[in-house]
UniProtKB/Swiss-Prot annotation:
Gene Ontology molecular functions: ABC-type vitamin B12 transporter activity; catalytic activity
Domain of life: Bacteria
Gene3D superfamilies (UniProt xref): 3.40.50.880, P-loop containing nucleotide triphosphate hydrolases (3.40.50.300)
Active site: C343, H451
Pathway: Cofactor biosynthesis; adenosylcobalamin biosynthesis
Gene label: cobQ
Domain GATase cobBQ-type, residue spans: 262-459
CDD domains xrefs: GATase1_CobQ (cd01750)
UniProt function note: Catalyzes amidations at positions B, D, E, and G on adenosylcobyrinic A,C-diamide. NH(2) groups are provided by glutamine, and one molecule of ATP is hydrogenolyzed for each amidation.
Name of this protein: Cobyric acid synthase
Keywords for the protein's UniProt record, in alphabetical order: Cobalamin biosynthesis, Glutamine amidotransferase
Family: Belongs to the CobB/CobQ family. CobQ subfamily.
Lineage: Bacteria, Bacillati, Cyanobacteriota, Cyanophyceae, Synechococcales
């Protein structure tokens, strides 16, 4: 039976819309998911279409946005690509990779996307919704919108917002960020641009990131409710940033919290950075201060530097060379520096990058084969097919430990013979997952394909101890707090804060 015929049987979905990008939709959905889980419900997150290079791989090898994976953790369930059936991974110049139900199906421009992919995209969204309800008929979907639901030039082909809300007859919440100012115009303007049948779906308004004396907003609350005839069901106070921003542009505003830390880490801010959630576990280490490196500089102030993943490795390697950062990294290595590359970062640490199918940002035949930074004797060749899979392995360095994570990458990396480069060893029992070298004069160079490597507590502890030892700092013998337990604690705290200030019960019937 089609889902349309069963809509009267399902639990009323809750949909979180926003007056703009960055209004707080993702965190609101995460909080509601945990609140409902604690109430004994079966919440499942859903976002029809997301645009992000911060991705996760489910247990079937399907790519999905990391924010929906995080929301699944808040529900206490395994993430699935069905929760984010369309993922667009931007590559610059209005070009994106299109992923349907976890599988890459092509590259498109913004103009061609709406022309060629709108109808197939809506079918994929409906297919995912039907599958979710078939597998878990008693679930309650907690749906996240994208950007603003009333972009008038796009609304007729918007797959993520009001089309989904109307299809499921969802109870909708409109979230707005008072921190940005103009909250009255944002709320009224958004609602005025909706059709009457769309506005009827809005059952509550949330004012997010409120600072100061709440009593001073009493008249404002009364005015909004009188003007819209929609109750304000929550005024959420300003909270410390608990999770990474969904958009890499927001990294420019993100600062590490641990200003008295003993270990200083520099992460290279690549133009096409991906999977910056890899560094959340380091952000939660009190002994570590993270700084994002955006321009050429002397890197000696850092105890180790990280070259992160990239959506366009060739393009980002060219950027490193032209900006001078490639030379900075070499000089840092020559001065006993410690370096670790993840995925695209591993590839850039090698001697050469070859892109015969123009998959990784090369724009001409001259860019199809370029030199890497040249610190590891590795050659990477990019192929048309992308590898996405969950990983379970065992590390050989800096400790023997079980390792979990996932891979998302094009290309195969191979060792090359070189008398001028250091000999390298495998980091893991699965030999093609990463390599390292320890230089006689001091310093290490390592690279791995495993995203989520720092979520492995023992591996992270021992790598940090290796750095501490190089600084003549006492090593930590006590195990650090499990990152996954810490993540659970953060989600619980987030849900508790929302629960204090949010009347969710009115939306459950």
């Amino acid at each position: 039976m089609e889902l349309e015929a069963k809509l009267h049987e399902i639990r009323k979905p809750i949909m979180v819309l926003g007056t703009s990008s960055g209004a707080g939709k993702s965190l609101t959905v995460t909080a509601i998911c945990r609140i409902l889980k604690n109430l004994g419900e079966e919440p499942i997150p859903f976002k029809g279409q997301n645009m992000s290079n911060n991705a996760w791989v489910d247990w079937e090898g399907g790519e999905m946005a990391y924010s929906q994976a995080l929301q699944a953790f808040a529900c206490g369930i395994n993430p699935s690509a069905e929760m984010n059936p369309i993922l667009l991974k931007p590559q610059g110049n209005s070009i994106s990779e299109v992923i349907h139900l976890g599988k890459s199906i092509g590259i498109t421009t913004a103009s061609n996307y709406y022309k060629d992919w709108f109808i197939p995209g809506w079918e994929v969204i409906k297919k995912s919704l039907s599958s979710i309800y078939e597998k878990t008929p008693n679930c309650r979907l907690i749906i996240e919108g994208a950007g603003s639901p009333v972009e008038m030039n796009l609304i007729h082909r918007d797959l993520t917002n009001l089309r989904v809300a109307k299809y499921l007859n969802a109870n909708c919440i409109l979230v707005t960020d008072i921190e940005r100012g103009g909250v009255f115009a944002q709320i009224i303007g958004t609602l005025e641009l909706m059709k009457p049948e769309e506005k009827k779906l809005i059952k509550g308004i949330i004012i997010n990131r409120f600072r100061g004396d709440l009593s001073l907003f009493a008249e404002g609350k009364k005015w909004i409710e009188s003007k819209t005839q929609i109750p304000i069901i929550g005024i959420i106070p300003w909270l410390n940033d608990s999770f990474p921003p969904e958009d890499s542009l927001d990294l420019l505003e993100k600062k590490s919290r641990h200003t008295t830390a003993e270990i200083k880490v520099g992460i290279i801010k690549l133009p096409s950075i991906s999977n910056f959630s890899d560094f959340d576990p380091l952000e939660n280490e009190k002994s570590i201060l993270i700084e994002w490196v955006r321009e050429s500089q002397n890197l000696k102030k850092f105890d180790f530097i990280i070259l992160p993943g990239s959506k366009q490795t060739i393009k980002d390697q060219i950027y490193l060379k032209e900006s001078g950062l490639s030379q900075d990294i070499k000089e840092y290595s020559n001065n006993k520096g410690n370096i670790i590359g993840i995925c695209g970062g591993l590839q850039m640490l090698g001697t050469s990058l070859e892109d015969p199918f123009f998959k990784e940002g090369s724009k001409s035949c001259l860019e199809q084969k370029i030199k890497g930074i040249g610190l590891l004797p590795l050659k990477t060749t990019f192929f048309e097919k992308k590898l996405t899979r969950q990983i379970s392995s065992e590390s050989l360095w800096p400790c023997h430990s079980k390792i979990n994570g996932f891979e998302i990458h094009n290309g195969k990396t191979e060792l090359v013979e070189s008398e001028n480069l250091l000999k390298i060893r495998p980091i893991f029992k699965d030999l093609d997952l990463g390599w390292y070298t320890e230089k006689k004069e001091g310093g290490t160079i390592a690279g791995t394909y495993i995203h989520g490597i720092f979520e492995n507590d023992n591996w992270r502890d021992q790598y940090i101890n290796l750095i501490r030892k190089s600084k003549n700092l006492p090593i930590f013998n006590k195990k650090s707090i499990s990152y996954k337990k810490k993540r659970e604690s953060i989600i619980d705290n987030l849900a508790n804060e929302f629960d204090k200030h949010l009347n969710i019960t009115s939306l459950l019937n």
